[in-house]
A protein has these predicted regions:
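Short structural boundary motif marking the start of a folded domain
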Residues: 1-5
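Extracellular beta-rich ligand/substrate-recognition surface
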Residues: 6-13
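NAD(P)H dinucleotide-binding glycine-rich loop of Rossmann-like/cofactor-binding domains
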Residues: 13, 90-119
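Short structured motifs
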Residues: 16-18
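Short Gly/Pro-enriched turn/cap motifs at secondary-structure boundaries
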Residues: 20-21, 53-59, 106-117
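Glycine-rich beta-strand-centered segment in the early N-terminal region that forms part
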Residues: 21-36, 46-97
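Conserved Rossmann-like nucleotide-cofactor binding loop
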Residues: 39
């Protein structure tokens, strides 16, 4: 079991016990989280001035160490240090078509629950 920091609708924080993530599937990696920041948006949610996060997830900026890789993963290996970007670029806007997905103007909204032990 692993622990994940969550927020209740009444804005109180708690740890939720979750099963250890399964072995990564094709194209997936498993990451042991090392750091996850509390950003301004997290603070707004905690203060009640921003929408309650989906499933009470907190954290969308973090880093960790790859612990396992699935089939067809070539660029990452166990032991590699990584940062996590929970947003999926749209692939259609000018930035994405110019190979600059970090400037995507229509990313998916992603709260990745980075305040956890493993992804």
């Amino acid at each position: 079991m692993i622990r994940s920091l969550r927020m209740q609708p009444n804005r109180k924080l708690y740890f939720k016990e979750l099963p250890m993530p399964s072995t990564p599937g094709p194209g997936e990696v498993q990451v042991r989280m090392a750091f996850a920041s509390i950003c301004g948006y997290d603070m707004m949610m905690l203060r009640g001035t921003a929408a309650y996060p989906l499933n009470g997830y907190l954290g969308h900026e973090g880093s960790g160490v790859v612990t396992a890789v699935g089939e067809n993963v070539r660029a990452l290996h166990p032991g590699d240090r990584v940062t996590i970007n929970p947003y999926e670029p749209c692939g259609l806007c000018d930035a994405c078509r110019s190979n600059r997905p970090e400037y995507c103007t229509n990313p998916s909204s992603g709260y990745a629950n980075l305040m956890t032990e493993y992804l």
